[in-house]
Amino acid sequence: MATAVSTIGSVNRAPPNLNGSSSSASVPSSTFLGSSLKKVNSRFTNSKVSSGSLRIVASVDEDKQTDKDRWKGLAFDTSDDQQDITRGKGKVDSLFQAPQGSGTHFAIMSSYEYISTGLRQYNFDNNMDGYYIAPAFMDKLVVHITKNFMTLPNMKVPLILGIWGGKGQGKSFQCELVFAKMRISPIMMSAGELESGNAGEPAKLIRQRYREAADIIRKGKMCALFINDLDAGAGRLGGTTQYTVNNQMVNATLMNIADNPTNVQLPGMYNKEENPRVPIIVTGNDFSTLYAPLIRDGRMEKFYWAPTREDRIGVCIGIFRSDNVAKEDIVKLVDTFPGQSIDFFGALRARVYDDEVRKWITGVGVDSIGKKLVNSKEGPPTFEQPKMTIEKLLEYGNMLVQEQENVKRVQLADKYLSEAALGDANSDAMNTGTFYG
């Protein structure tokens, strides 16, 4: 028995091999188990590692990474493919994500849809095409955009530029010309997107469009957020305008973005990641209808656009640039209709083409218009350039003015509300001699 005890204490234990695959640990042999036990090699090494050979490697210090590091871009998402949001879903622990169904967990649009709907691209050079940009307008817009991309010491630059003025004065088109001149592709919004059947949706859309513009700036290209007719979507036009919660949230969102332009978060996501500053340009007709704290000087810089005579002549030269109209005739045309908007002259030019369209309809027949325009193998019709004389332009201009006066003078809505029958609705046409019947 003593022999058996002594043999049990002689069990051989192979030391662990830290080198891995060159040698392997063997099954311990024992006299007690018998001398016929075969030794086999195991593919697994002992996981117990000696503390004397343990090597600890520190993590990489990101502060020591320089801008010259060729692999630096791997740590940042530089793709503009919105489907990256969907592909990355589930890669991050839920602790660091916002609640489901909010934020950017789900792709809002594909990249092509962003380009086709939100992103406005320009493929023309306004200097070559002869478009006129008013110097005062260009100065105000260029200075505002440039200031917002600069870091000025001890100075708070207003984020929003509000351009307002009369209807049809070319505010939006002048902005687009300046954007094209500066090679900026702005993210566009309109007043129709500032209201929704869902409460809070327009405010969320403003933040999404702002962050989309910030992503473009982060990738090294200038961008801006351009909102058309802000007062029509967020203002109060008389006592009959219904003031909804979306109007309130749109005003509050723009105020919050103007106060914190580099920390614009989506609803439900509150990480402290800064975004580039994006200048916001808005247009409108009457900013007195907006919420007063939004248009205060620290948040919005206001610019009243009233084109001078020289501006109107310059814009009209651009409108009639392909019609071979002499500059003297354009000056006479502008001076003949001094109270009209710039858009009036564009409508006047379109009215001249009515004669050519009327000739084409007479040639093909009224019953064949659909076949020729919608389902035709011949392609769209082409017209010769109509000759525009000053006499014809003045004639059509007076016709447009007369139509404007009729709208202001003959207010049939008041007659319909005050009388059950048609009443004197045709009296104006009878008095002017244009009523036949």
Curated annotation (Swiss-Prot):
ATP binds at residues 165-172. GO terms for molecular function: ATP binding; ATP hydrolysis activity; ribulose-1,5-bisphosphate carboxylase/oxygenase activator activity. Keywords: ATP-binding, Chloroplast, Nucleotide-binding, Plastid, Transit peptide. It is found in: Plastid, Chloroplast stroma. Its main location: plastid. Residues 1-10 have a biased composition (Polar residues). InterPro entries: ATPase_AAA_core, P-loop_NTPase, RCA-like, RuBisCO_activase_AAA_helical. Pfam families: AAA, RuBisCO_activase_AAA_helical. Residues 1-26 are annotated as: Disordered. Activation of RuBisCO (ribulose-1,5-bisphosphate carboxylase/oxygenase; EC 4.1.1.39) involves the ATP-dependent carboxylation of the epsilon-amino group of lysine leading to a carbamate structure. This is Ribulose bisphosphate carboxylase/oxygenase activase, chloroplastic. It comes from Malus domestica. The gene is RCA.
